[in-house]
Amino acid sequence: MRPHILLNLVGGLLLTSLAMPSAQAADEAAALPEPDGPVMLTVGGDISRTNVGDEARFDRTMLEALPARTIVTSTPWHPESNRFEGPLAEAVLHAAGAEGRRVRVIALNGFEAMIPVSDFERYDVILAMQRNGTPMPIRDFGPLFVLYPFDAHPELVTEAIRFRSVWQVNRIEVY
């Protein structure tokens, strides 16, 4: 290879590697906007992006703007397949700048479950906001439901995963 081509290649790689940390730092430092509507979810604990005190609060519009997924599955509570839609749990944690390896998911009634963040990454778990195209009311597992893709991964049909499938979610604490 000619020396000037090699120097250009090495120089380009060096500039790219120097720019990446600054872009990452800018992304991590990006402010989280304050919610305009009623707060559906509060994330606290080991997070770096906040919008109210030391918490990240999300309204419906903010949650709908995050990367999302549709899961068609039955659940231990819904024997027939349903279409669930909502933001990826991992995307919610990323938006809050979560640093931890575990989360405590808390429901409106005080029920809580510890969930390893690796579950969110491995199974593309969502915080379901809609079932069959309709927002989920509190009386029907809403407003948010930690949903695993049960039908796609039969190994998820266990007592441990059922316990992690919290519904009526309103808070997540990151550890």
Regions picked out by a protein language model, each given a short descriptive name:
Residues Q24-Y175:
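N-terminal intrinsically disordered, low-complexity segments enriched in P/E/S/T
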Residues N8-A19:
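Bacterial N-terminal signal peptides
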Residues M1-H4:
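Positively charged n-region of N-terminal signal peptides that target proteins for export
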